[in-house]
Amino acid sequence: MGKTVTYQRPDGGSVNAYLAEPAGTAGAPAVVVIQEWWGLNDQIRGVADRFAQAGYRALVPDLYRGRSTLDAEEAHHLMTNLNFGDAAGQDIAGAVAHLKGSGSAKVGVTGFCMGGALTTLSAVHVPAMDAGVIWYGYPPLEYVDAGRIKAPLMGHWAIHDAPFPIAGVDALEAKLKAAGVKFEFFRYDAQHAFFNETQVGEKKLLPVLEYNPALAAQAWQRTVEFFGRTLR
């Protein structure tokens, strides 16, 4: 369904990305999809394909510049070497601008794990984004200037999340409330990465990950309905 495209960052640099588009829907709303710490892999391409099937243009920036991994130690290395401010303010900002410049009047941002943290930062640093859906990931809260967030947000969080403890979600929620941000958070009786269908049984890349199909379906439905309200 999708293809590789190249777009420009605000600073003029180029970024490769995976683009999935609905058939015969010119000017459809769009979503920038941000990867987990594993990189731009088949699983995140599949998420973009699902958005396309739901009627959205979906663009996945290649934040690691062609690298991806199944090894947690290497993924941690790739993530810690990523400049999050640059990724949000340049790669993701450029993705939003590219989609708006190619026919989409409204563009949302969504991301998983590391991508959830980047979605939160994008709400601060990318004023052109029209809505955001955060999946079980947040940055250090001192980097969240909630007063700058204008886009409505939705968050899907796992109560038993080891990488991103729920106490941090409570603190983020309080910060957003204090700033008057329009948002809705949902907490699920699940572990980290409960939306990732590859994290099941012996296929799990880390023991703290666990796919939950029922909760994944519920969160997906909420996401599609939210973008339907905010992007259409």
Where are these regions (language model features)?
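N-terminal cap/leader regions of alpha/beta-hydrolase-fold enzymes
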Residues: M1-R232
